[in-house]
């Protein structure tokens, strides 16, 4: 079991190398495919001879960068709620691809069958990390492009606007909701109210307990990074310039300030977070009228159910759990 947990952590550990100038060529190893603008395809539904669900694959222009994007929508002439999917840390494509897993594609397809539109976009760091350079912060990694994506959704025929953030993307969703008008609700999926450096410290300590004190030192340095102190040192794969930017966020405060309906979903089987994260959510928001908290026992960090007796199963495609899709959809539709 310990070996299995180590494999999961090595695959899924919070790594912010998307803001590092030394970036592996992720496009060669990813299942992501470059697509021309305005290419649309139908998504067939089981037992449905003619589907109203369509995908529009296009290039989203944001801050001088061209980002591949997919808008999945109901082409029936009616307004539907729409959700922006926000990926976790690292240089993710629009499907948040990891091996055979494509959680954002699965979520988009599942939500579409519930009558909910969605937009997913390559992270800027997926294609342009080297151009962004060492001084990349959450603005360059997330906020600028998410704001552009929200404006795109506002221009469509939608009846409500939601943000669904996975992992670090959940914290970003809260940050956006506290600053953007017109967001109707947010979902934080396997995310945390704790500082990212503290979570990374815990993750590394699980893998390498002998060096826990060093990891605590790194976390302290990341949390204390300021404009005056930043010199380009790296902690947990991110420069201190990045941590200066990240340190401006307060996820719990952002949720309170946004004052909109919020769904927090975590799992006790998530090896990238800890029971402490669930307990903190409950301590912060168990009495909130706007915040719903749901805890699963059997889904991984990316949402899939994994056979814990077979480590090789993480390399095999599995269906995204329908009950998690239903949790998302029911929240968005107010059911």
Predicted region positions:
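Conserved alpha/beta-hydrolase
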Residues: 103-128
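Accessory cap/linker subdomain of secreted extracellular hydrolases
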Residues: 187-255
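Conserved alpha/beta-hydrolase "acid-adjacent" motif
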Residues: 271-277
């Amino acid at each position: 079991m310990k070996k299995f947990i180590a494999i999961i952590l090595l695959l899924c550990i919070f790594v912010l190398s998307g803001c590092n100038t030394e970036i592996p060529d992720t496009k060669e190893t990813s299942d992501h495919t470059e697509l021309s603008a305005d290419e649309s395809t139908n998504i067939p539904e089981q037992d449905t001879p003619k589907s109203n669900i369509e995908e529009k694959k296009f290039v989203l222009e944001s801050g001088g960068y061209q980002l591949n994007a997919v808008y999945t929508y109901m082409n029936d002439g009616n307004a539907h709620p729409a959700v922006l999917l926000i990926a976790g840390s690292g240089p993710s494509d629009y499907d948040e691809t990891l091996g055979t897993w494509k959680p954002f594609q699965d979520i988009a397809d599942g939500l579409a069958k519930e009558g909910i539109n969605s937009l997913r976009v390559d992270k800027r760091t997926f294609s342009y990390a080297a151009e962004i350079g060492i001084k990349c912060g959450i603005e360059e990694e997330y906020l600028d492009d998410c704001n552009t994506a929200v404006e795109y959704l506002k221009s469509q025929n939608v009846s409500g606007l939601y943000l669904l953030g996975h992992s670090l993307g959940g914290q970003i969703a809260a940050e956006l909701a506290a600053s953007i008008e017109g967001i109707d609700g947010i979902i934080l999926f396997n995310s945390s109210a704790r500082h990212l450096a503290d979570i990374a410290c815990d993750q590394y300590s699980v893998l390498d307990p002998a060096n826990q004190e060093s990891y605590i030192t790194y976390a302290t340095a990341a949390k204390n990074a300021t404009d005056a102190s930043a010199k380009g040192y790296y902690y947990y794969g991110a420069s201190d310039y990045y941590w200066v930017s990240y340190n401006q966020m307060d996820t719990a405060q952002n949720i309170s300030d946004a004052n909109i309906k919020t769904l927090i979903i975590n799992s006790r089987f998530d090896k990238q977070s800890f029971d402490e994260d669930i307990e903190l959510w409950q301590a912060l928001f168990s009495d909130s009228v706007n915040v719903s908290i749901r805890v699963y026992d059997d889904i991984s960090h990316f949402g899939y159910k994994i056979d814990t007796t077979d480590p090789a199963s993480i390399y095999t495609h599995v269906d995204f759990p329908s009950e998690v899709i239903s949790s998302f959809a029911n929240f968005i539709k107010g059911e």
